[in-house]
Design a protein with these regions (language model features):
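Polytopic alpha-helical membrane proteins, predominantly small-molecule transporters/carriers
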Residues: 1-285
């Protein structure tokens, strides 16, 4: 049962991280430099947080480093696409596209390649969240909105790949390292890539105001701890159970946060959130 508590906490943290991501984009734009600056700071800070949580001990294997490197590339693309998509999406709609990809692809991966059971509650959960997502999508008006649709699909696919890589790593016990070491290695890879990008492209390291660093530190804490909790849960829970819970939970928390921030989600979004909540409860019990 405690693993479900971990996932609920992770849901809340992932929902909050969207808020800090959105604030960064508003102040710094959504260009390539901004995306790499965002990733450099957040992953550097997250690495330090995980290093402390792991007792200043890190383990490495060739398999973990390889998966971490691929994972890092996916995260960079995901970060850039996320910043670009915020130019038209509100918090609840963006999170729905992100989390749906994070649910469906790992779900299918677990069922097809790891022979996880495809039960009636799981099928009902997938169907309900699919309906919720379709209801929540609000077609943009104008060429700018249509042009950003590609970024919605990008975060859909890339977040799904994050789940697949996590499942792949955690399912190979003889080759993988502990969850804290793996996520710290991922963060270190992203930080190194972003630092190299700035040194080659701009010949300098971007410096941000203390207030902005604080905002990114909040994002890093939410992302780093949330991903760590998910990896710990994934050592026991099937991907076909875990990722629907994450998806439904984030949809619910994100919509609540949107209401608190007076973004006024539509009636369809509220109904979709209720459906997501029911589907999450269904797969847990």
């Amino acid at each position: 049962m405690y693993l479900y508590v971990f996932l609920i906490i992770a849901d809340l943290l992932f929902s909050l991280q969207f808020l800090f991501n959105q604030q960064f984009r508003k102040r710094n734009g959504d260009g390539l430099d901004s995306a790499f600056t965002f990733s450099m700071y957040t992953n550097g800070i997250s690495f330090l947080i995980l290093l402390v949580l792991n007792g200043f001990k890190l383990s490495f294997t060739w398999f973990s480093v390889l998966i971490a490197f691929i994972y890092a590339l996916v995260l960079l693309l995901y970060s850039y696409s996320g910043l670009k998509s915020f130019s038209t999406a509100n918090l609840s709609v963006y999170s729905i596209f992100t989390m749906l990809g994070g649910m469906l692809l790992p779900f299918a991966f677990g069922v097809i390649f790891y022979k996880e059971d495809f039960t009636l509650p799981k099928a009902a959960c997938i169907l309900l969240i699919g309906i919720a997502t379709a209801m929540s999508f609000e077609k943009g008006k104008g060429s700018k909105d249509r042009g950003n649709l590609k970024y919605y699909f990008a975060v859909f696919i890339l977040n799904g790949l994050v789940g697949i890589l996590s499942k792949l790593h955690q399912s190979n016990a003889e080759l993988c390292v502990d969850s804290g070491s793996f996520m710290a290695t991922v963060n270190l890879c992203v930080f190194a890539m972003c630092l190299g990008f700035h040194l080659v492209r701009n010949k300098k390291v971007p410096l941000l105001p203390i207030k902005e660093v604080g905002n990114l530190a909040c994002y890093a804490a939410c992302s780093g701890i949330g991903n760590l909790l998910c990896l710990i849960a994934l050592t026991t829970l099937p991907a076909s159970v875990q990722y629907p819970i994450i998806t439904g939970g984030v949809m619910v928390f994100s919509t609540v946060i949107s209401i608190i921030r007076k973004e006024k989600p539509s009636v369809k979004t509220l109904i979709a959130t209720a459906i997501a909540f029911v589907s999450t409860i269904l797969i847990m019990f």
